[in-house]
Amino acid sequence: MSIFNLKKPKALGTGQMIQNGGISDKEVLSKLLGYRKSVVAGYRSLLVDDISSNIAFGEMYVSPKIDGELWFLIIDNGEAALSNTSGKVIFGDIPLLDEVKAQMSQFQGQSIFAGELYVATKDTRPRVSDLASALGGGPKAEVNKLGFAVFDVLHGGDSKSVMPLVEYAERLEMMQRIFEKGKRVKCVKTEVANTPEDAKDFYDSWVEEGNAEGLIIR
């Protein structure tokens, strides 16, 4: 039985979208809501000048912050879809989902990945306003520009490792392995920092000199 309720969809470019109520499985929806709550509770916003005084020495996983929205990639019973915590579901002939479907045999049962849904641009950094425009584009939506940067795993995995995995290093290794050949769906760029100065260097490279919105430190 599918966990999705895909009745009365609306066109989204070459694919389709359910505005709300697209997740019929309450346990799955609870996982999405619980993850979002834990992420929001765990975030602490810092100015770049505060990095040295607020970040402790020790191993950290540093990633560029992409200006998009938190969504979830869900693989279940041969289906692949994107959902947010409101049960808005994107499915069908969407290029990034087609990419996932092509590697369906890699996943072990139901798998759920958290990530940033964004609109890819060539010359500037992604902006959440572009995503809002794309998702509101109906039949004319440019879904070929949608990208998904995976940064965590909630459930499932592949033949080498499955959740639960307590250490982020283990989850990261799994994500990098599964999505290593992805073009539209990739594991977010992640580097190891050991000191506040290391973190500041990544900020300078990715934010000041690059197109990242900010820095995520785990």
Segments from the language model and where they lie:
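A short, Trp-centered hydrophobic/proline-enriched beta-strand micro-motif
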Residues: 38-41, 61, 113, 214-218
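Low-complexity, highly charged intrinsically disordered N-terminal segments
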Residues: 2-21
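Charged, flexible boundary elements
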Residues: 18-57, 62
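Exposed boundary/loop context
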Residues: 8, 14-15, 27, 35, ...
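Amphipathic alpha-helical
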Residues: 30, 186-218
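Short, motif-level signal for alpha-helix interfacial/capping segments enriched in acidic residues
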Residues: 45-49, 124, 128-133, 194-201
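Covalent nucleotidyltransferase
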Residues: 53-183
